[in-house]
């Protein structure tokens, strides 16, 4: 089973690959995705879609608006992986 730390690292990799402008920016679990980073709503949609593909999970669209921090995103992925 994948650990939370592994989910976090893979999530960061996907974000850095999806948003090259974030190169050199430290992403922590408390990083607010839409305000602390250069990710706009379209970029956020791209990141979530790529994360769903990377982890082979589906995060319902209605839950996306509740994903504020990197930790929230990791929580959502972790929850889906343990189902």
Explain the meaning of each model-derived region.
Residues 1-24, 80-83:
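Thiotemplate assembly-line natural product biosynthesis machinery
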Residues 10, 69-72:
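Charged catalytic carboxylate motif
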Residues 18-38, 54-66:
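Phosphopantetheine carrier-protein modules
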Residues 43:
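Two-component histidine kinase catalytic core, primarily the HATPase_c
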Residues 71-80:
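C-terminal structural segments of small proteins and small subunits
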